[in-house]
Amino acid sequence: MTKPTILTGDRPTGKLHIGHYVGSLQNRVKMQNEDKYNMFVFLADQQALTDHAKEPELIRQSVGDVALDYLAAGLDPEKSTIFIQSQIPELAELSMYYMNLVSLARLERNPTVKTEIAQKAFGESIPAGFLVYPVSQAADITAFKATHVPVGNDQKPMIEQTREIVRSFNNAYHTDVLVEPEGIYPENEAAGRLPGLDGNAKMSKSLGNGIFLADDMDTLKKKVMSMYTDPDHIKVEDPGKIEGNMVFHYLDVFGKAEDAEQISEMKAQYQAGGLGDVKTKRFLLDVLDRELSPIRERRIEFAQNMDYVYDMLKAGSLKAQAVASQTLDEVKSAMGINYFK
């Protein structure tokens, strides 16, 4: 029986933070180790350039950083094909063919794209590459005939757009070459979109409100001790709110089964009064360090041998290119533009 194929990846615009870890990376490692899937994991550097075209040095540095984060978190190049998007030219060619099947109006209606355009404040200067990046995503997914794509709930419109492109292509060219993917969405809503340390809905490097997998213990401690809690909880004896309190939100996400009873007791005590923010933050620091210290240590080890990291990326890219090339041949054959045998 053929294994389902998983495609997943990240835009390399900086080091990965713990929101990436609980939102997707942790689950990728789990699926990889189950040995039930063909796993493709990629660094979407071309997509990153759609809104960082004048910062190629940032993208180049980030490719290495994200690759380190992948390896440190447990992705294994023996079990997952890890590759760089720009090193697979077949993806750009597939994108060109798919763009002919999607209207500009449909791209502009994509809710995810509309939200991101507003967030980035492009105004009237929206890069064309950014507007059409859902088509590029469709090329990424279909090139490897991915059956399943793990994404956040905010990416559902992207999966649906890919499915539309697949149906449009297969209908137009009377073929079944392309596979309609299914999205895999987070089961844990709290982990699916981890807020920033300051309570902002989004954790990001630009907002300075994230904990990164590469952060050392001193940095982690400073960030945890500065976290947003209940602004009205001034004295230890004051009753406090746990809703919107980032310390308790993070404890819900990162706490293990063995922590559940203590977390429950802390919530009750905090709400009744008698538990200070410093104590809750120290407990969270221990919980986070338990999770992150092995990742941090592995990352330091891999960073000492970047030749290995780039050799791994090169090997993965060559392996991925062979698969994408086969799909492109099938696509061109279906379209009738395979002129030379």
Swiss-Prot record:
Origin organism lineage: Bacteria, Bacillati, Bacillota, Bacilli, Lactobacillales
Protein name: Tryptophan--tRNA ligase
Residues engaged in binding L-tryptophan: 140
Intervals of motif 'HIGH' region: 12-20
Gene Ontology CC annotations of this record: cytosol
Record's keyword annotation contains Manganese: no
Subunit structure: Homodimer.
UniProt catalytic activity: tRNA(Trp) + L-tryptophan + ATP = L-tryptophyl-tRNA(Trp) + AMP + diphosphate + H(+)
EC code(s) of this entry: 6.1.1.2
Species assigned in the record: Lactococcus lactis subsp. lactis (strain IL1403)
Residues in the signal sequence: none
Pfam families, A to Z: tRNA-synt_1b
Role description: Catalyzes the attachment of tryptophan to tRNA(Trp).
Keywords, alphabetical: Aminoacyl-tRNA synthetase, ATP-binding, Cytoplasm, Ligase, Nucleotide-binding, Protein biosynthesis
Molecular function in Gene Ontology: ATP binding; tryptophan-tRNA ligase activity
Record: residues binding ATP: 11-13, 19-20, 152-154, 194, 202-206
Keyword Transferase: no
